[in-house]
């Protein structure tokens, strides 16, 4: 012990001399446990008892230091826990996770285990606090301790102790007594006076607060068997250290000593000081009290001397030694002794068993026991002590129930992802009314899973998007051959006479073909009209497929060069691959047909711009019988051909003829369209040369072309699509709905003929076109072979004045139809029809979408759906070549030979309802952009052309002139 008056050691390493001294006490050993908070580096809470550990002591969690003063009956156990700042700092340094809640509850769980041990092995437990007021969190700790003791410890500890030699000593309560709880506060409030009355008053006030809190939360009860701790009756159990400085600040003391040394008072007092002192009313005025004054109040000195933690503790130790430990603490006492003192040896045996069961086995992961209650204590105690987690989880469960209920109550029978997301957002708001804490994210994830499972349980909508961007409303789990979005549009048929209700299309075929074919059955006009037959895909095998553009384009592009002579040294691999892909290959060694086709192409004086897959060929023989409306006989191969693209009245025409461009350029006028006539003998020679290489039964239009019979074009034909691919069905429609007389410019389009037009927007625009014909030059013109009629036209001139009626029709989803008088203006009756209105219309780009002028809460977009053309009664044919630019694609009719519109007839060209490129759907815009009306698509200007009508008189000579209207 050396200079110290006490012994200290680490449990269980008790020194032999101390063991012999404790053995002399027999059954009069009182064990006092000291636990609580500390701020020192050694985690010492024994400073109030004037005891300290060794200087080399290192604190650790769960470490127990024993203190014993010889001559006393008190064995003090100092518990080092996570409530000590030194131990807590060690745990923080070793912490790797940033989850503070998890760290905090683990630190609290360790403290609860150590305090649980103290309550089972000690007679008196002193809780030390560094604060000046009572820490109410201790009440929570006591609640946890009571829960653990009643729900876990009492279920296994008495039974397992009875299996050892200490079971009879501790009894059914598994502890020597209900320990008396004392509270020691190391610091006294600075603003309180340190007199006996004030200190006692403050201690009594704190005792009342502690007593009421422990009573309120059933920590302290009247029954000794159910009470966790005991409090003495009519005896002080709260101690405030008001006089001693337990943890002095060494630096502050050094600074104070330095100031005292440097400011020594003078030994002699000056005369002036003596004069001032003589004026004092009494001795000691304006001077500090000396030692004599401090010794005057002996009662205060005695109180200060006796008011120590050791004296405070010994009063309770004496109660334990005298057998008054439980008297006054409980109103209900059992007949069996509630308190018993053990010898040092017996207590050490009990301590070893309880320490092993409560502390040691917890850290042993390999420990196995058959006692299920003890196994639950070892594995589940930490979770059961995490009451914050239980609290937050309970709130999250309440919020989860509320959120799920809100979701299910508002959920319809069948709904899609947008509705699901909105319902989930509403359920989240309902959850947040109750859910709180760190487990909100987990609860929200569970809420999302529950709602998703509820949605997928027969309530999920198919949600296959239509070509207009609307989801399918049918149940996903139920088999359905046809999708349906529940949205119905009003649309007209090909001829425009009949309107019907169309469902939102989900395939390109439904949008551009099937609906119009179904409506044509109900339309009296559609079944009678003559239609232009567009080139379509004809399969040669049963397992034909859509073209894969990424893989097929190299072969498709390579196949375009097969008409050119092959380069010497090339292998036959490409030819073999092409033979498999296409059913009708043309070898590169046979260029003769190509040259003859080129000869036919050169016969036109003013060709239109290049269209899909070939040069423009205006030969009337290339159109077949489907376009010879109003003619009684087939086209003669010897007839001349002329063609040109119609230009505006202010734009000069440009001749592209090989032989006569220089001769006719000077003759072109500013306001006329010049057409160069081809001599019949030249055309006849070219036709005969072509017939030598082709079968006699085939015309120019029916010649075999390079088209695939195994792969088809999945989308619409556009300028960049391969010429070898054809679509499965036509997305366009061109029909002659009757003679030109069915349209009256005075009344416009009548409802019985074209239904759904808005008032004033049902007029076609007149278009005056002036044409001048250039006859071929002959060295010896065979005038003797001309008829009289042709000679009269020849003499009267070669000018034509054509009046064409054109209308650009737009149609909205409500079935409203209207014409446009300019790219940015809807036709408003006859007042909007001016002389140059149509010229400005056809020579400018037209927007593909335009706002419908119909009144409604929602603004509907109308789409360019039809072009109305009333052809003139003149010996010319109108040629249509529409090009619709949507995004990066420019869509065309996909015809190698452009269609001719017959004379004096009413023609309607119906545009596709939906545009689709190479496997890329082009959705309509959500709204119209006035600043850029062509952003969503446009019809390019210059879609009309003109060609001379072929004569039906096969007896006429090649040099006979054509019949035409004079200017």
Swiss-Prot record:
Membrane-crossing segments per the record: none
GO biological process, one term: nuclear-transcribed mRNA catabolic process, nonsense-mediated decay
Cysteine pairings via disulfide bonds: none
UniProt keyword annotations, A-Z: Nonsense-mediated mRNA decay
Alphabetical list of Pfam families matching this protein: Smg8_Smg9
Positions of the UniProt region annotated as Disordered: 627-702
Signal sequence annotation: none
Acidic residues composition-biased segments: 628-639
Biased composition regions of type Polar residues, renumbered to the chain: 686-702
InterPro entries: SMG8-like (IPR019354)
Feature: compositional bias, Low complexity: 643-666
Function text: Involved in nonsense-mediated decay (NMD) of mRNAs containing premature stop codons. Probable component of kinase complex containing nonC and recruited to stalled ribosomes.
Entry's family note: Belongs to the SMG8 family.
Name the record gives this protein: Nonsense-mediated mRNA decay factor SMG8
Organism: Drosophila mojavensis
